[in-house]
Amino acid sequence: MREESRSRKRKHIPVDIEEVEVRSKYFKKNERTVELVKENKINKDLQNYGGVNIDWIKALKPIEYFEWIESRTCDDPRTWGRPITKEEMINDSGAKVPESFLPIYNRVRLMRSKVKTPVDAMGCSMIPVLVSNKCGIPSEKVDPKNFRLQFLIGTMLSAQTRDERMAQAALNITEYCLNTLKIAEGITLDGLLKIDEPVLANLIRCVSFYTRKANFIKRTAQLLVDNFDSDIPYDIEGILSLPGVGPKMGYLTLQKGWGLIAGICVDVHVHRLCKMWNWVDPIKCKTAEHTRKELQVWLPHSLWYEINTVLVGFGQLICMARGKRCDLCLANDVCNARNEKLIESSKFHQLEDKEDIEKVYSHWLDTVTNGITTERHKKK
């Protein structure tokens, strides 16, 4: 998967809106007033953000465990309809928040509260439960340790792969474990160790780099047994020691596996949008890791988890890398990267009655929910 504004009048829907220094050729000293986040300090101060008791989590029963994870990493779109206030944007570093953040982000959250996107239906966080349910394994029967493993495998499969294909690959492995290996729990460490690597590669052929990923998964399974008490690591160093696992996957796995919000998960959508809106330095932030470190300087910890889900879904359906729908975007009156010609020709711009505009937008929301993302797709 690849990847100035001028004043004008138009109709729109109103919206109420440590000491390890990061060294890189892209990050030179004294070029910005805000220093990049210090990784050691974040880990040292985790208790201030509600650090977790790993032994306590391991002892939780399935229902208790999933309630705990849900309380830490809520993906309920209904919570995104409420605008974030300036008071909520206070951060520990005292760093200045980009002026465009709240006007744009509040509108993006509102849009995300209305539509269901691929990441909501088939993203990594949904895969273990969705696949288990599809295979007849009820949520309350999913062992937390297996859930954590299945989530990790899902993230490894997801690299440079669409959510739908990743979900299919996870389903293929699960069905093989159930039907061929006769493992009632689906994907387990024992099952992954028993599957021959060529067989595993064939099961996940629908994802990109499936041969390499099969090798990574086999090696990871053995490492978890040898070095991590047959469970996933609970710190970023341990997670990153696994083959094929990078920071994006690592922080997301810590979030959904242990409820530990130790860093922001920055994928291609988050990286692209944050640079486009100048929330991070678009010149210095050449990689997702650069973007993550800059974001963590000023973004309040309370938003570290949700920003990934919010922006990924927005980037999948409304502000794609190619074919942006500025004509349908509620943030097109505050966005610095809007397409003026597209907006001028839109139905929103032509309509004079706000009620009609809301009606058109509601109809568009219905089509998106039903899986149709653009008028171009409908014509095809």
Swiss-Prot record:
Domain of life per record: Eukaryota
Post-translational modification: Monosumoylated.
Enzyme Commission identifier(s): 3.2.2.-, 4.2.99.18
Motif mapping: Nuclear localization signal: 8-12, 376-380
Keyword check for DNA damage: yes
GO BP term, pick one: nucleotide-excision repair
Annotated knockout phenotype: Greatly increases spontaneous and hydrogen peroxide-induced mutation frequency.
Reaction(s) the record says it catalyses: 2'-deoxyribonucleotide-(2'-deoxyribose 5'-phosphate)-2'-deoxyribonucleotide-DNA = a 3'-end 2'-deoxyribonucleotide-(2,3-dehydro-2,3-deoxyribose 5'-phosphate)-DNA + a 5'-end 5'-phospho-2'-deoxyribonucleoside-DNA + H(+)
Site residues (Important for catalytic activity), renumbered to this chain: D267
Places the protein is found: Nucleus
Active-site residues from the entry: K248
Keywords recorded for this protein, A-Z: 4Fe-4S, DNA damage, DNA repair, Glycosidase, Hydrolase, Iron, Iron-sulfur, Isopeptide bond, Lyase, Metal-binding, Nucleus, Ubl conjugation
Broad class of where this protein is predominantly found: nucleus
Domain HhH: residue ranges: 228-252
Cross-referenced CDD domains: ENDO3c
Requisite cofactors: [4Fe-4S] cluster
UniProt-annotated stretches for the region Interaction with MLH1: 15-40
InterPro entries for the chain: DNA_glycosylase (IPR011257), Endonuclease-III-like_CS2 (IPR004036), Endonuclease3_FeS-loop_motif (IPR003651), HhH-GPD_domain (IPR003265), HhH_base_excis_C (IPR023170), NTH1 (IPR030841)
Description of what induces expression: Constitutively expressed.
Note: Present with 125 molecules/cell in log phase SD medium.
Record's function text: Bifunctional DNA N-glycosylase with associated apurinic/apyrimidinic (AP) lyase function that catalyzes the first step in base excision repair (BER), the primary repair pathway for the repair of oxidative DNA damage. The DNA N-glycosylase activity releases the damaged DNA base from DNA by cleaving the N-glycosidic bond, leaving an AP site. The AP-lyase activity cleaves the phosphodiester bond 3' to the AP site by a beta-elimination. Primarily recognizes and repairs oxidative base damage of pyrimidines, but also purine-derived lesions, alkylation damage as well as abasic sites.
Similarity-based family: Belongs to the Nth/MutY family.
UniProt subunit comment: Interacts with MLH1.
Protein's name according to its UniProt entry: Endonuclease III homolog 2
Organism: Saccharomyces cerevisiae (strain ATCC 204508 / S288c) (Baker's yeast)
Chain's gene name: NTG2
